[in-house]
Amino acid sequence: MKIGILSQDIRLYSTKRLYETAVERGHDTEVVSYLRCYMNIAKAKPRIFSAGRELSFDSVIPRIAATWTFYGAAVVRQFELMGSVSANSSAGISRSRDKLRALQLIGNTGVEMPVTGYGHFSRDVESVLKSVGEPPFVIKLLEGTQGRGVVLTETMDAAISVIETMKKIDANILVQEFISCLLYTSPSPRDS
Protein backbone atom coordinates (compact mmCIF):
# COMPACT_ATOMS: atom_id res chain seq x y z
CA MET A 1 0.00 0.00 0.00
CA LYS A 2 1.23 3.50 -0.80
CA ILE A 3 0.89 5.68 2.31
CA GLY A 4 1.44 9.41 2.64
CA ILE A 5 2.06 10.81 6.12
CA LEU A 6 1.03 14.47 6.07
CA SER A 7 3.21 16.21 8.63
CA GLN A 8 5.28 19.33 9.04
CA ASP A 9 8.47 17.53 9.97
CA ILE A 10 9.86 13.97 9.77
CA ARG A 11 11.81 14.71 12.96
CA LEU A 12 8.64 14.87 15.08
CA TYR A 13 8.54 11.74 17.24
CA SER A 14 4.99 10.72 16.29
CA THR A 15 5.70 11.21 12.59
CA LYS A 16 8.96 9.27 12.79
CA ARG A 17 7.26 6.33 14.57
CA LEU A 18 4.39 6.21 12.07
CA TYR A 19 6.88 6.20 9.21
CA GLU A 20 9.09 3.51 10.76
CA THR A 21 6.12 1.26 11.54
CA ALA A 22 4.62 1.61 8.05
CA VAL A 23 7.97 0.80 6.41
CA GLU A 24 8.53 -2.18 8.77
CA ARG A 25 5.17 -3.56 7.63
CA GLY A 26 6.19 -3.34 4.00
CA HIS A 27 4.30 -0.23 2.90
CA ASP A 28 5.66 2.25 0.38
CA THR A 29 5.62 5.28 2.68
CA GLU A 30 6.45 8.94 2.24
CA VAL A 31 6.31 11.90 4.63
CA VAL A 32 4.96 14.99 2.89
CA SER A 33 4.78 18.48 4.38
CA TYR A 34 1.14 19.41 3.90
CA LEU A 35 2.17 23.07 4.11
CA ARG A 36 4.18 22.62 0.90
CA CYS A 37 1.31 20.98 -0.95
CA TYR A 38 -0.70 22.91 -3.48
CA MET A 39 -3.91 21.91 -5.19
CA ASN A 40 -5.31 22.01 -8.68
CA ILE A 41 -9.08 22.17 -8.44
CA ALA A 42 -10.69 21.41 -11.79
CA LYS A 43 -13.77 19.70 -13.16
CA ALA A 44 -13.75 16.01 -12.15
CA LYS A 45 -9.95 15.89 -11.81
CA PRO A 46 -8.71 16.88 -8.34
CA ARG A 47 -4.92 16.94 -8.17
CA ILE A 48 -2.34 17.75 -5.53
CA PHE A 49 1.33 18.61 -5.89
CA SER A 50 4.44 19.19 -3.81
CA ALA A 51 7.70 20.59 -5.19
CA GLY A 52 6.38 20.29 -8.75
CA ARG A 53 5.54 16.59 -8.39
CA GLU A 54 1.98 15.26 -8.50
CA LEU A 55 1.12 13.18 -5.43
CA SER A 56 -1.05 10.08 -5.22
CA PHE A 57 -1.53 7.77 -2.23
CA ASP A 58 -3.80 4.85 -1.40
CA SER A 59 -4.02 6.18 2.14
CA VAL A 60 -2.98 9.30 4.04
CA ILE A 61 -2.26 9.73 7.73
CA PRO A 62 -2.78 13.38 8.67
CA ARG A 63 -0.67 14.94 11.44
CA ILE A 64 -2.17 18.42 11.22
CA ALA A 65 -1.07 21.10 13.70
CA ALA A 66 -3.87 23.10 15.32
CA THR A 67 -2.52 26.36 13.91
CA TRP A 68 -2.86 25.00 10.37
CA THR A 69 -6.25 23.27 10.70
CA PHE A 70 -7.96 25.08 7.82
CA TYR A 71 -5.18 24.50 5.29
CA GLY A 72 -4.36 21.00 6.53
CA ALA A 73 -8.01 19.93 6.32
CA ALA A 74 -8.18 21.33 2.77
CA VAL A 75 -5.17 19.21 1.76
CA VAL A 76 -6.71 16.10 3.35
CA ARG A 77 -10.04 16.83 1.63
CA GLN A 78 -8.26 17.05 -1.73
CA PHE A 79 -6.68 13.63 -1.15
CA GLU A 80 -10.12 12.26 -0.17
CA LEU A 81 -11.58 13.62 -3.42
CA MET A 82 -8.79 11.83 -5.29
CA GLY A 83 -9.85 8.53 -3.68
CA SER A 84 -7.28 8.28 -0.88
CA VAL A 85 -8.51 6.80 2.38
CA SER A 86 -7.64 9.06 5.31
CA ALA A 87 -6.99 7.86 8.86
CA ASN A 88 -8.71 11.07 10.01
CA SER A 89 -11.25 12.65 7.69
CA SER A 90 -11.00 16.31 6.74
CA ALA A 91 -14.41 16.89 8.36
CA GLY A 92 -13.27 15.12 11.54
CA ILE A 93 -10.12 17.25 11.73
CA SER A 94 -12.12 20.46 11.34
CA ARG A 95 -14.77 19.39 13.84
CA SER A 96 -12.24 18.28 16.43
CA ARG A 97 -10.77 21.78 16.54
CA ASP A 98 -14.13 23.56 16.87
CA LYS A 99 -14.57 24.13 20.62
CA LEU A 100 -17.86 25.96 20.21
CA ARG A 101 -19.46 23.17 18.18
CA ALA A 102 -18.24 20.58 20.68
CA LEU A 103 -19.67 22.55 23.60
CA GLN A 104 -23.01 23.01 21.82
CA LEU A 105 -23.28 19.28 21.16
CA ILE A 106 -22.19 18.30 24.68
CA GLY A 107 -24.56 20.84 26.23
CA ASN A 108 -27.45 19.38 24.28
CA THR A 109 -26.83 15.87 25.68
CA GLY A 110 -27.34 16.77 29.32
CA VAL A 111 -23.71 16.10 30.28
CA GLU A 112 -22.56 18.29 33.17
CA MET A 113 -20.34 21.10 31.96
CA PRO A 114 -19.47 24.68 32.89
CA VAL A 115 -21.99 27.34 31.90
CA THR A 116 -20.55 28.90 28.75
CA GLY A 117 -21.26 32.22 27.07
CA TYR A 118 -20.48 33.08 23.48
CA GLY A 119 -21.37 36.20 21.57
CA HIS A 120 -19.98 38.73 19.18
CA PHE A 121 -19.10 40.91 22.20
CA SER A 122 -19.57 44.05 20.14
CA ARG A 123 -21.56 46.00 22.69
CA ASP A 124 -22.87 44.44 25.86
CA VAL A 125 -19.95 42.49 27.31
CA GLU A 126 -21.26 42.74 30.86
CA SER A 127 -24.62 41.14 29.95
CA VAL A 128 -22.87 38.17 28.36
CA LEU A 129 -20.74 37.77 31.49
CA LYS A 130 -23.80 38.00 33.75
CA SER A 131 -25.54 35.31 31.67
CA VAL A 132 -22.69 32.99 32.68
CA GLY A 133 -22.86 33.91 36.38
CA GLU A 134 -20.59 35.65 38.84
CA PRO A 135 -16.79 35.96 38.74
CA PRO A 136 -14.36 34.34 38.56
CA PHE A 137 -14.61 33.60 34.83
CA VAL A 138 -12.48 31.54 32.48
CA ILE A 139 -12.04 33.38 29.18
CA LYS A 140 -10.83 31.31 26.23
CA LEU A 141 -9.88 31.94 22.64
CA LEU A 142 -11.77 29.54 20.39
CA GLU A 143 -8.60 28.93 18.40
CA GLY A 144 -6.26 28.33 21.35
CA THR A 145 -4.86 24.90 22.19
CA GLN A 146 -3.06 23.31 25.11
CA GLY A 147 -3.85 26.16 27.51
CA ARG A 148 -2.79 28.99 25.22
CA GLY A 149 -5.30 31.81 25.09
CA VAL A 150 -6.93 30.92 28.43
CA VAL A 151 -7.27 33.56 31.15
CA LEU A 152 -8.78 33.29 34.63
CA THR A 153 -10.33 36.59 35.69
CA GLU A 154 -11.25 37.15 39.33
CA THR A 155 -13.52 40.20 38.90
CA MET A 156 -16.11 41.57 36.49
CA ASP A 157 -13.83 44.51 35.63
CA ALA A 158 -10.90 42.18 34.90
CA ALA A 159 -13.10 40.02 32.65
CA ILE A 160 -14.36 43.05 30.73
CA SER A 161 -10.79 44.31 30.32
CA VAL A 162 -9.55 40.95 28.98
CA ILE A 163 -12.46 40.65 26.54
CA GLU A 164 -11.98 44.24 25.32
CA THR A 165 -8.30 43.46 24.68
CA MET A 166 -9.10 40.22 22.82
CA LYS A 167 -11.72 42.04 20.73
CA LYS A 168 -8.96 44.30 19.36
CA ILE A 169 -7.49 41.29 17.55
CA ASP A 170 -10.94 40.14 16.34
CA ALA A 171 -10.67 36.96 18.38
CA ASN A 172 -13.60 34.59 18.91
CA ILE A 173 -14.02 34.25 22.65
CA LEU A 174 -15.79 31.87 25.04
CA VAL A 175 -16.57 32.80 28.63
CA GLN A 176 -17.07 29.99 31.13
CA GLU A 177 -17.92 29.79 34.77
CA PHE A 178 -14.95 28.85 36.89
CA ILE A 179 -15.38 25.53 38.65
CA SER A 180 -13.05 25.19 41.57
CA CYS A 181 -12.02 21.83 42.84
CA LEU A 182 -10.05 20.59 45.75
CA LEU A 183 -7.11 18.51 44.74
CA TYR A 184 -6.75 15.31 46.70
CA THR A 185 -3.27 14.59 47.87
CA SER A 186 -2.49 11.31 49.48
CA PRO A 187 -1.13 11.47 53.01
CA SER A 188 2.61 11.42 53.20
CA PRO A 189 4.29 8.48 54.96
CA ARG A 190 5.21 10.88 57.78
CA ASP A 191 1.51 11.42 58.57
CA SER A 192 1.03 7.74 59.44
Where are these regions (language model features)?
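N-terminal beta1-alpha1 cap of cysteine-dependent amidohydrolase-like domains
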Residues: 7, 17, 21-23, 32-45
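N-terminal glycine-rich "phosphate-gripper" loop used for MgATP/nucleotide binding
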Residues: 35-80, 91-96
